């Protein structure tokens, strides 16, 4: 009987090991594709990924979220209801980044120092932010993204934020949803127009 029990235990251990190995392989394959399901995925993404899709990341508890290490990144997509905790979001010095898409109800920190910084991304073409994302952030600065053509936000984004636009010579359209920057105390638009017509639309739906 004891031998049978030992065999059963060995089989159980092997089964557990096989499951663990399978889970590790699935995580590795997922991360190689730039898919994020939790904070561990994000921390272990290969720096050479060209696309990042954040499906879920409620357990990310750092105040700073910095994408700047991903120098090969072309597409950044964050699905709804992600990243409730970070108060400083940096998307900076990414030479190949073309598209940023952030879903609804992301980034809900109301820290006094909360800020979104999108700077020095020379290939960036479009930035889209869904309803109620960054609602209580205090600063939104987007600068030195010469190829950016379209900036779109849903409703209730950055309701109290200082808004800075600088060095956006290619900008064609700014589309702001309801209540965006409604209580903003400071807005700076510098070098964004370059004599070209920029269409600004209010109360847009994303």
Where are each of the predicted segments found?
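N-terminal capping/linker segments that flank leucine-rich repeat
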Residues: 10-11, 15-56
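Leucine-rich repeat
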Residues: 38-46, 63-69, 89-92, 116-118, ...
């Amino acid at each position: 009987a004891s031998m049978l029990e030992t065999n059963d235990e060995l089989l159980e251990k092997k089964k557990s090991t096989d499951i663990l190995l399978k889970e590790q392989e699935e995580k590795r394959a997922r991360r190689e594709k730039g898919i994020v399901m939790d904070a561990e995925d994000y921390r272990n993404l290969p720096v050479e990924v060209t696309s990042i899709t954040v499906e879920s990341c409620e357990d990310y508890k750092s105040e700073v979220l910095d994408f700047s290490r991903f120098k090969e990144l072309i597409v950044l997509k964050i699905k709804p209801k992600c990243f409730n905790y970070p108060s400083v979001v940096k998307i900076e010095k990414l030479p190949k980044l073309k598209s940023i898409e952030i879903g609804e109800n992301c980034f809900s920190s109301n820290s006094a120092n909360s800020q979104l910084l999108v700077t020095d991304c020379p290939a960036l073409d479009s930035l889209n932010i869904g309803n109620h994302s960054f609602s209580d952030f205090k600063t939104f600065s987007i600068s030195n993204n010469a190829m950016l053509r379209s900036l779109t936000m849903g409703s209730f984004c950055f309701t109290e934020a200082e808004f800075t636009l600088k060095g956006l010579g290619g900008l064609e359209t700014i589309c702001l949803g309801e209540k965006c920057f409604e209580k903003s105390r400071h807005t700076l638009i510098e070098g964004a127009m370059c004599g070209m017509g920029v269409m600004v639309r209010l109360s847009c739906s994303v």
